[in-house]
Amino acid sequence: MFLSLFVAATMVQVVQFDELREDPHNTRTLLQSYETERGPILVNGEPIAYSTPVDTEYKYQRVYEHGELYANLTGYFTHTQGATGMESAMNAELSGQSDAQFFEGLTALFTGNKPAGAAVELTIDPDVQQKAYDALGDVQGSVVAMDPRTGQVIAMVSKPSYDPNELVVPSTQEVLDKYTELLEDDSQPLFNRAIGGNLQHPGSSFKVVVATAALENGLIKADTPLPNPPKYTLPGTSSVVYNPVHGQKCGDGETTNLKIALQYSCNIPFADLAIQLGADKIRAQAEKFGFNKPLEIPLDVTPSVYPTEAMDQAQVGLTGFGQFDVRVSPLQMAMVSAAIENGGVLMKPQLVNQVVSADLNQLQGPQVSEYGRVMSEETAKTMNELLLYSVSNGVAGSARIDGIDVGGKTGTAENGPDEPHTLWFTGYAASGNTHVAVAVMVEKGGGVDSASQDVLAATIGQQVLKAVLEQ
């Protein structure tokens, strides 16, 4: 009995020491963190979160500049609710307790200097972040923009947002009241919709993944003739699939092809392609893009989902245009476009540009790395041509920018009878040495009529692409 207790205690003290030390929910760690001047979180060298001295037992209080603009990124650091967002993910560095800061802390101990946390600079571009936030307006949704060549996230917006300053006031009761109010808010402002929360059906934006799978597996080419009926009954059911305009074919011909199907966002060809491919091949392609896999950027990203359980042919057909149990985050759809723009190679998304200690030593630089090759160069070239055509001559036309080649795909996802649609745009553009991929997700149909829904997400995407390219 004594031996068991000794071993357990030793495990906690030695093996789990780092984990406990870095856990922002650990009460002792929390109090120690407030004794130290916590490092700032920076965007383009300017603090968006920093500590200021206060005359309380906690010594310091966090201040969040432009709180609602960056809340989904910074999160909060409070004495009652712990920490979220980058405040949690980079807690060890911000509190001066990371392994890389050990000797700095040791030096402070001997010199009598006050220890201080490191500064964490994000990859976010403040101008693009602001323009993405403004472009979303009053709708519930999210925007993600990233550099396809490096994986660095340029903008990450989630709405509705909240002001984290209201969660760091000295009054415990005020903090609890505000936290409860946010938690019970039906619009779920505490969720970072860009990377998690309630994942959404991607709708027709998922056709990009299915088209890639069809090309990679040699099932078809861009101009391979495909059946073109005005309606399609899913195998083994009485359920009928229509193209966006009920009862109309995909183009004027007796047959259609992948180029036309993406141009007009036709559902029938993609339901048929999905059934021909089968779930395993679609899933394998989706997982190359990052579906069904954990990811830290260093914020924890909720894995997007292509179903792993057995499906019948009808269900597989529905996944062909992003329905049934396919669920995605905006970051995931930005990754899909980024891989195509980057010649088939997906770079790992990253939010941290650098970490700098209180004595100005760089503890960490940009972490640029490949996530993996998602498709062949040939497939990427074909997909690029198809998506450029979808914007220049198709339903994604609201993303057009004069003088710039823009590729992309819209999506209008169904959420059940009488439920408003989820709207999507994923795309990319480049000008000179500037490259950008973007994803836009708008919940509840954006609160607009069905005719306006077709262009809303693409219009937002176009504004964000322009914001990056015009700098």
Please name every model-derived segment:
Residues M1-V175, L199, T224, D280-E287, ...:
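Periplasmic/cell-envelope proteins involved in peptidoglycan metabolism and beta-lactam response
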